[in-house]
């Protein structure tokens, strides 16, 4: 049994979660006609309520009014035992065609939103009916080894949904302070701290110790750190935008860049181009094949 709240996970796991979260965010964006940058938890909740049969229930240990009535549609209220309320933030279970999601409303609003996103992640990605699983989200309790991977994944994806990578990078490159990012996204201090740690480590490739150092300085409103992180984000995105050098092997045995290959082909006769085309066919060199065809047709004009 292992404890879980924030845990360091393998980069392969994290990047898998990014792909899943981005795919879902793109679906929400397409259906709601809201850019991913402008998607907030309320938009995600509405998407799920429109596409799934969900019954939300808020719970406490004593009778109370529903505090956040506008957060979900037609919520119920139930009273649960103190021992369960004191250790459980949320619960998701399948019931025939419906999904029942229970949320502890004694928590701060930021944590309630995160818990809802966490439970919706279970619903969307973890095939509740197939697995016959009931997922219980605990404050800092222990999970069995068979449940822990699901909880790690739900925590990561919920964080990515709460503040998408696009949104986080936009705010970081606009020199937003930690507090301003927190207010803009609606995340808790702890939630944003974890989100930044994961981003700096898994996406920007910093060591855990360096990522923690920068996050702590950012929380202390260190402006130099704000600029340093901005440069790291911009450098990463600029590298992604830079066209990759394409290397092509030609019949003479040389491996040359694409521009050099185009120049080489321009100096060939028609018969030589045909020979080069045969070489491209035989070696399944599709880029060379296309470049030869382009030059062949150009010479025929």
Residue ranges and their predicted role:
Residues 1-301:
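Active-site hotspot residues in diverse enzymes, especially metal/ion-binding acidic/histidine motifs
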